[in-house]
From Swiss-Prot:
Motif extent (KLKR): 632-635
Residue list for modification Phosphotyrosine: Y557
Changes after translation: NTN1-induced PKA phosphorylation on Ser-255 directly parallels the formation of filopodial protrusions.
Protein name, as recorded: Protein enabled homolog
Family: Belongs to the Ena/VASP family.
Tissue specificity remark: Expressed in heart and testis, lower levels in lung, skeletal muscle, kidney, pancreas and brain. Isoform 5 is expressed exclusively in the brain. Isoform 2 is expressed predominantly in brain, testis, ovary and fat. In the brain, isoforms 2 and 5 are expressed at highest levels in the hippocampus, cortex and midbrain, and at lowest levels in the striatum and cerebellum. Isoform 6 is expressed in brain and spleen.
Segments of this protein annotated with the region EVH2 block A: 623-643
Length: 802
């Protein structure tokens, strides 16, 4: 065959569908084809043949007639038409389009060279200027053979040379295209490899990060676990140390209390009360107040001595509070502690010596716990004097003889000769043993009591013993009253004068005592063995009436003194407290009815106790000294005692002695209510003075408002304050010493309101005083507001003029 390919290009062959007016792929399937232009050298004709690259399907086979209109619509899409249809080639690249267009132009030139050279140029220009689908007449198909010799055209050799050059160029372009294809594939492969490598690296980094986070989390959990274990060990160690400290404290207290307990177990029979008289005339003693049915057997007291294992020592904050009060007041009395000085703790808690004398089965209160509440202490008439010696080096002044009301379960301990430094640190208690089922031998004959003070005297300040304030909750009789004592539900305590106590022996003590009096010296005072004669004038009193059961921490109810006909039953207690003890039995048939109660005994001056000059004559002087000493304590801060209204009186007896505690325990209430009137007049005078100062400078007005706030807060205490020199801040500490000093209005209860001559004085002029004070405050505030507005206006006017 004499046909040769003069051109090769890669293009998608398309045909135009006249029915649908769109281009469709030739052969029915899309894809690139190899399109060739073949030149038949024998008859000098050209045709276009295209085959699919994939399956070599022939998609175009058409002849190139002379005068063909070849249209290059775009750089990569060329088109032409023949008699049957319109063809289009969508080339793969610009190079393929240029090569195919050059070969097509060459073929058209060869075909047109048979006519004239001018027609060749015209055909080339027409083909380049054609921009649309053929709009000229359809060219006839050339089937005739061209003549062998072409007139006025290139020779056959020239055409062969041109054809070979075109083929060479085509081969070079094909090689270049294949090289570029290989490079492109290589680039794509490298790109894929790079992406894969980056993905693997990213995954590896992610795994490493997760592993690192896991390791860090495990390490953090391990550290947290170690920290928790360390904290747990530290907490266990601290708890162990605290337990050891508590055990050590308990063992030390038990070991300190053991000698006293042992001495009480082996105590001799009760000594004669005649040997226990104070050096001079002491306060009225309970010489006749003894238990009617009592056994002279000593083991009775030993049985009562044994305490149950439930007795718990007070907490250390109580000791700190008592030490703070004792140090700040500088009292001449060393604090005698209620929790330590009263009941010794036996070393062996299970040891309870057997008693040869049958004790009554109705004595469960004697075995109760010794952890007494703070409201356990209320006023009581004087009880037998007992000498309480302070530890050496702690008491700064002469030691007074303090009357103490002691519970019946507490044994009487003889003095001890083993006190260090020659001073005795033990406390001797008079005991009222529990009644037995049958008659017993009478106790030793008591000494004749000193005559009571004359009743017409105004009641002097209460005795300086807080236990006096509460031992009468069972309607205990006054001094010299014959009365049989019964066992109480709770042992009494020996309070400390330091809990809000005065600074000298002349100052009246607080009749109510809180837990703040529990300090370390009292522990030493209760723990010393007592077996020898009492040194330093230790005085032992006869048995005192039993104390009442502990009251709740609400209002502390004190007992009312019994009327002349007989002792009334104890007052009703709040539902939160333990049941009251049985009332004291009536007077014995062989004794006269109790006389009217005398006024309470005055505070014992230290000099009078030790020099033997205490008598009935100097009691008014003692009350004056107490008032002077009370004036020195104006700035002493006090713990809130609003829950102790009226000092705790519960009786409705209108005797003068029952009013001695009406003023919050600050002192006796003067007869006739003169103290109340003086207090009200002083309050009104101070308010008038404040009102006169109201027109001064602004700072003074603020101070006046602060002073006005004081009467508002302390109105209720001032209405019941018995002494005209008392101020609202002068109340002694009657509750827990660890609380902050707060002044509050007492709660008015029918059983505890103070009275003067039988008239209730709680809310006498309260509303009028309140209204006057509020009016004064409004006036002062209005003045202050006007002055402030004037000052601001002056400043603004000055700034405007400037």
């Amino acid at each position: 065959m004499s046909e040769q390919s003069i051109c090769q290009a890669r293009a998608a062959v398309m045909v135009y569908d006249d029915a649908n007016k769109k281009w469709v792929p030739a052969g029915g399937s899309t894809g690139f084809s190899r399109v060739h232009i073949y030149h038949h050298t024998g008859n000098n004709t050209f045709r276009v043949v295209g085959r699919k690259i994939q399956d070599h399907q022939v998609v175009i086979n058409c002849a190139i007639p002379k005068g063909l209109k070849y249209n290059q619509a775009t750089q990569t899409f060329h088109q032409w038409r023949d008699a049957r249809q319109v063809y289009g080639l969508n080339f793969g690249s610009k190079e393929d389009a240029n090569v195919f267009a050059s070969a097509m132009m060459h073929a058209l030139e060869v075909l047109n060279s048979q006519e004239a050279a001018q027609s060749k140029v015209t055909a080339t220009q027409d083909s380049t200027n054609l921009r649309c689908i053929f709009c000229g007449p359809t060219l006839p198909r050339q089937n005739s053979q061209l003549p062998a010799q072409v007139q006025n055209g290139p020779s056959q050799e020239e055409l062969e040379i041109q054809r070979r050059q075109l083929q060479e160029q085509q081969r070079q372009k094909e090689l270049e295209r294949e090289r570029m294809e290989r490079e492109r594939l290589e680039r794509e492969r490298l790109e894929r490899e790079r992406l894969e490598r980056e993905r693997l690296e990213q995954e590896q980094l992610e795994r490493q990060r997760q592993e690192r986070e896991h390791v860090e989390r495990l390490e953090r959990e391990r550290l947290e676990r170690l920290e928790r274990e360390r904290q747990e060990r530290e907490r266990e160690r601290l708890e162990q140390l605290e337990r050891e400290q508590v055990e050590w404290e308990r063992e030390r207290r038990m070991s300190n209390a053991a000698p006293s307990s042992d001495s009480s177990l082996s105590s001799a029979p009760l000594p004669e009360y005649s040997s226990c008289q104070p050096p001079s005339a002491p306060p009225p003693s309970y010489a006749k107040v003894i238990s009617a049915p009592v056994s002279d057997a000593t083991p009775d007291y030993a049985v009562v001595t044994a305490l149950p294992p439930t007795s718990t020592p007070p907490t250390p904050p109580l000791r700190h509070a008592a030490t703070r009060f004792a140090t700040s007041l500088g009292s001449a009395f060393h604090p005698v502690l209620p929790h330590y000085a009263t009941v010794p703790r036996p070393l062996n808690k299970n040891s309870r010596p057997s008693s040869p004398v049958n004790t009554p089965s109705s004595q469960p209160p004697a075995a109760k716990s010794c952890a007494w509440p703070t409201s356990n202490f209320s006023p009581l008439p004087p009880s037998p004097p007992i000498m309480i010696s302070s530890p050496p080096g702690k008491a700064t002044g002469p030691r007074p003889v303090l009357p103490v009301c002691v519970s019946s379960p507490v044994p009487q301990m003889p003095p001890s000769p083993t006190a260090p430094n020659g001073s005795l640190d033990s406390v001797t208690y008079p005991v009222s043993p529990p009644p037995t089922s049958g008659p017993a031998a009478p106790p030793p004959p008591p000494p004749p009591p000193p005559p009571p003070p004359p009743p017409p005297l105004p009641p002097p300040p209460l005795p300086p013993l807080a236990s006096l304030s509460h031992c009468g909750s069972q309607a205990s009789p006054p001094p010299g009253t014959p009365l049989a004592s019964t066992p109480s539900s709770k042992p009494s305590v020996l309070p400390s004068p330091s809990a809000g106590a005065p600074a000298s022996a002349e100052t009246p003590l607080n009749p109510e005592l809180g837990d703040s009096s529990a300090s370390e010296p009292g522990l030493q005072a209760a723990s010393q063995p007592a077996e020898s004669p009492t040194p330093q004038g230790l005085v032992l009193g006869p048995p005192a009436p039993p104390p009442p059961p502990p009251l709740p921490s609400g209002p502390a109810y004190a007992s009312a003194l019994p009327p002349p006909p007989g002792p009334p039953p104890p007052p009703p207690l709040p539902s939160t407290g333990p049941p009251p003890p049985p009332p004291p039995p009536p007077p014995l048939p062989n004794q006269a009815p109790p006389p009217p109660p005398p006024p309470p005994a005055p505070p014992l001056p230290a000099s009078g106790i030790f020099s033997g000059s205490t008598s009935e004559d100097n009691r008014p002087l003692t009350g004056l000294a107490a008032a002077i000493a009370g004036a020195k304590l104006r700035k002493v801060s006090r713990v809130e005692d609003g829950s102790f209204p009226g000092g705790g009186n519960t009786g409705s007896v209108s005797l003068a002695s029952s009013k001695a505690d009406a003023g919050r325990g600050n002192g006796p209430l003067p007869l006739g209510g003169s103290g109340l009137m003086e207090e009200m007049s002083a309050l009104l005078a101070r308010r008038r003075r404040i009102a006169e100062k109201g027109s001064t400078i602004e700072t003074e007005q603020k101070e006046d408002r602060n002073e006005d706030a004081e009467p508002i807060t302390a109105k209720a205490p001032s209405t019941s304050t018995p002494e005209p020199t008392r101020k609202p801040w002068e109340r002694t500490n009657t509750m827990n010493g660890s609380k902050s000093p707060v002044i509050s209005r007492p709660k008015s209860t029918p059983s505890s309101q103070p009275s003067a001559n039988g008239v209730q004085t709680e809310g006498l002029d309260y509303d009028r005083l309140k209204q006057d004070i509020l009016d004064e405050m409004r006036k002062e505030l209005a003045k202050l507001k006007e002055e402030l507005i004037d000052a601001i206006r002056q400043e603004l006017s000055k700034s405007n003029t400037a």
